[in-house]
């Protein structure tokens, strides 16, 4: 469907399927992705990994991840989320200043169609990162300062604070 002529936006995308028994796991699943993305400047790709590329690999060009799998472990969930958070930049973009760096991916996104699961994972992970913190809200606040949570509410996109995350998650 993505390649259909009438689908003006998506028709230029290449879908890479890194799934199934023959795909490998981690670095072994990466070559078809790298081949499709190339440098990342003139390609449009969607990678379907089904858990094959969630730990141990980094694809700097990835700008978002769509979570569909019901991961129980916050560590596994965030390993997948952090794959997309890796920086993508080039040093000395104009060839005249070796100290200059151009950021090519200033933001990234994690989309999850199970918001309660996502917020539960976020709260458990935040609390786990700060075992000495007596107030769970403070622990989660620290995490969301690096990983803000946005929610679509009708026609508006709003940021959810640590208290809101805990209210929904618990």
Q: Across the structure, where does each feature detected by a protein language model lie?
A:
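Conserved strand-helix element at the start of the C-terminal RecA-like helicase core
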Residues: 1
């Amino acid at each position: 469907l993505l390649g259909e002529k009438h689908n003006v936006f998506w028709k230029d995308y290449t879908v890479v399927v890194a799934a199934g028994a023959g795909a490998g796991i981690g670095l072994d699943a990466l070559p078809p992705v790298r081949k499709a993305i190339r440098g990342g400047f003139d390609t449009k790709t969607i990678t379907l990994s089904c858990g094959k590329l969630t730990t141990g690999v980094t694809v700097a060009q990835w700008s978002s991840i769509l979570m569909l799998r019901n991961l129980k472990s916050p560590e596994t969930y965030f390993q997948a989320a952090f794959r997309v958070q890796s920086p993508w930049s080039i040093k000395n973009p104009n060839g005249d200043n070796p100290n200059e760096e151009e950021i090519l991916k200033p933001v990234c996104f994690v989309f999850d169609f199970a918001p309660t699961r996502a917020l539960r994972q976020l709260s458990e992970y935040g609390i786990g990162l700060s075992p000495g913190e007596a107030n769970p809200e403070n622990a989660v606040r620290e995490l969301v300062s690096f990983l803000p949570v946005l929610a679509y509410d009708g026609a508006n996109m709003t940021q959810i604070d640590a208290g809101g995350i805990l209210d929904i998650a618990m």
